[in-house]
Amino acid sequence: MACAALLSDASSGTDGSPIDVLIVDDSLVVRRVLGRVLGEDPRFRVVGTVASGKQALAFVAKKSVDLVLLDIDMPELDGLQVLPHLLGPDQRRQVVLLSGSCSEGSEVALQALALGAGDVVAKPSAGHFSPQFVEHLLDRLAHLAPAAERSRTPERFDEASARLRPPGTLVRAVAIGGSTGGISAILSVIKGLEDNPAFPIFITQHLPASFQPLLAEQLRRATHLPVVLAEQAMPVQPGTIHLAPGTAHLSLGKGARGQILVRLSTQRCLHESFPAVDPMFTALARHYGRGACGVILSGMGRDGLAGAQAIVGADGWVIAQDHQSSAVWGMPGSVVKGGLASATLPPAQIAELILQQWQAGA
């Protein structure tokens, strides 16, 4: 049910004009190769090539750019230092890290995603841009292109005028979902909840499977609460963080004795996020009812919207990350605009509200 909800923004239509790309790499050879590769694809238009993070900031201050291809190891400002500033004042410009340091599953790659990168791609040496790599890169960039194109005319929404629902007074379980920019927000929420071991916590973050063990390790460093990668039929434990694996959606079911168990699903959702937030939220609503608390954090698209509807329909409640603290306000924004949120807050205050309402209902 949750998987049949809404298409993500990444699959929405665009106006057909090419995406304006800035290439940032200290290697002249790489800049030329990437410029040629992108220049031959009608979906993209290379508007500039620069050799450093400092030059990139100067460029975007003067010229509109939809998508930035960014190296990490550069003089003056490296890619990780400049990344948050390149996202733009409304945090809607797409930045893709393309670096030899960004092998899939590496801690550097996870750090880049935590800072708001739309994607990370491991870069081969300049002389080894094979046709297979070029096709892979263009496919990854094309997936982000519709969202980058919409950054030209960002939708205006007065967050202060949003209709908010009353917060719940019963907290039996908390489920947290995020995507682009969500990792740092998740860590902040978890740090605020670590002194309360009374309820189980479920987390779905849009990440490939190879990154999930690294995220689990980051969570363990952030809290003394136990952190487990969810497995099929695993009993749900209070005071434990259950992290969705990258290979399946995190859902819930009941065992023969009525205990709540982890259920993993590989059913594809229409919005194609994997793992997706909607199945987790929907399962939370089904098994915890008015004690279900959903938290939707920074991310592109609308994953979590259908699940938030399920939580509210079961008399549970949902908290959305506020616009100002979000790298991308797509997922939380869709919940707020849908009138489903009980509060819009920065991550640290989300944890405070959950504990406040839990104590009120204890």
Positions of PLM-derived features:
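Conserved acid/base catalytic micro-environments in cytosolic active-site loops
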Residues: A2-I23, S27-R43, T49, K54-L69, ...
